[in-house]
Amino acid sequence: MPLPPPRFHHLHLNSRDPDAAIDFYVRRFPTSVKTRWGGRPALGAPNDVLVLFDRVATPPPTSPQTAIWHFGWHVPDSRRTVESFRGQPDVELLPLYTGDDGGAVLVSSDTWPGTGGVLGRTKAQIAEAKATAVPPTRTGGFGYLRGPDDALVEYAGNHPAERFNHVHLYHEDPFCAQLWYQRHLGAQVPAGRTPPAPVTEATCRVPRGPDRTFPALDRDGMFRTPSAAVAFGDVAFPSYMRQGDRPLVGTRGHLYDHFALAVGDLDAWVARLGDEGVALLEQPYRLGDTRAVMIEGPSREAIELVEVR
């Protein structure tokens, strides 16, 4: 009998001061609440999503790059959110470089919109946008702030309600990773994010797009193709190919330590994943008043399966 697909449970962060970190996020995203789960301090979002925290003695590393790039929220009005953040002295808003002679904006809708389904433009496409007087939309868009412990946090609008909505990943091969999540964990592919042509294990490895795009947190732009995505419930996992030439490292012990999915029958999942050759990082263990197991994803991301009956 097929196992019901997991749902997203939590993102797990390492922090020098979990209580201060949670307070920071509650002030920025006020539909969230400070809570506890499994004996750990936690942030609770209104869509039944948690961010759990472990206290660490030293700043949690954010490099070398792991498979987890950042996490983010939907907001009803991203431009109003930016203006609100501007007035808060403990918020550091991060510039998005536009690829236009060092120009930068705080929200993507203040520069040229993406094209061809990509959230950015190459320098050649920027030149074309200038030549044809393509205007910024000045509505919605995405931006970033620096969170506690050097976390990278995205806010994106305009959406019906504020909620935790995604964990953005890097993968060695995004389409292969998408297949892995579908095959082993029953992930869904969000509407509009299916590959342009059917992908198989024989065809999922594709080269990284040659051109960087803007806006981007890096002055030199970022590679946005190929792009893939999966989802568990209403939490999405979009992904790009890793940006540099160094292989991604494991997530354990880093700022973004792992993410967790809720399953109904842990023993059945352990048996299934074992039969499928999925790597176990930790055998089943107690987690609060339930049990969990830690597996490894296709780009060395640690994934916790939490039994929730």
How should these model regions be labeled?
Residues 1, 86-169, 191-231, 238-242, ...:
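Vicinal oxygen chelate
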Residues 16-18, 75-80, 173-174, 263-267:
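Helix N-cap motif at beta-to-alpha junctions
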Residues 21-26, 85, 150, 177-182, ...:
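Conserved active-site tyrosine of GNAT-family acetyltransferases
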Residues 27-34, 89-92, 183-189, 278-279:
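Conserved acetyl-CoA-binding loop of GNAT-fold acetyltransferases
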Residues 173-197:
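Solenoidal tandem-repeat scaffolds enriched in leucines and small polar residues
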